[in-house]
Amino acid sequence: MYYVGVDIGGTGIKVGIVTDGGEIIAKGAISTSVKDGYEVIVKEMAKLIEDTVSDAKITPDDVASIGIGCPGSIDDKKGEVIYSNNLEFKNVPLCAELKKYIDKPIYINNDANCAALGEFFALGDDTVE
């Protein structure tokens, strides 16, 4: 199985496809504008995920789940961005919105928490991306 990691920022979105062992097999990135609104950003994110999965030469069925790192205050239980100044999001049900395009388990947390978890699981590996 493979996993999709998504990093949402105020000016862009980055996506990585990783193996069970943590090896990155594909990456993608796009620029975004917060002025477009969350609906457009989610649609662009879904397209980027689909394109990156295709670039990895795997099928959507090979993807186990999607994890999203997002700046701001996050309700990880509801899959909602409570408030993100960078993105101009307020009470955005991000996981539910993305699920309209991609039917996979989707998880979200604050981007700093995601970075800390990545560092922890890499245990000081100098090649962490």
Can you say where each PLM-predicted feature lies in the sequence?
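Short loop/turn microsegments at loop-to-beta-strand junctions
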Residues: I13, G69-C70
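Phosphate-binding/catalytic loop of phosphoryl-transfer enzymes
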Residues: D20, S65-G67, S73-E129
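Phosphate/pyrophosphate-binding loops at sites that engage ATP/ADP/AMP, CoA/4′-phosphopantetheine
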Residues: M45-I66, P105-I106, G124
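Short, hydrophobic/aromatic-rich segments at coil-to-beta transitions
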Residues: M1-Y2, E129
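N-terminal, well-ordered alpha-helical segments
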Residues: K43-E50, V92, A96
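Short, basic and Ser/Thr-rich N-terminal targeting/leader segments
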Residues: G9-T11, D62-A64, N110
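Glycine-rich His-Gly loop
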Residues: I8, P71-G72
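Short glycine-rich, Thr/Ser-proximal phosphate-binding strand/loop in the N-terminal lobe
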Residues: Y2-K47, E80-Y83
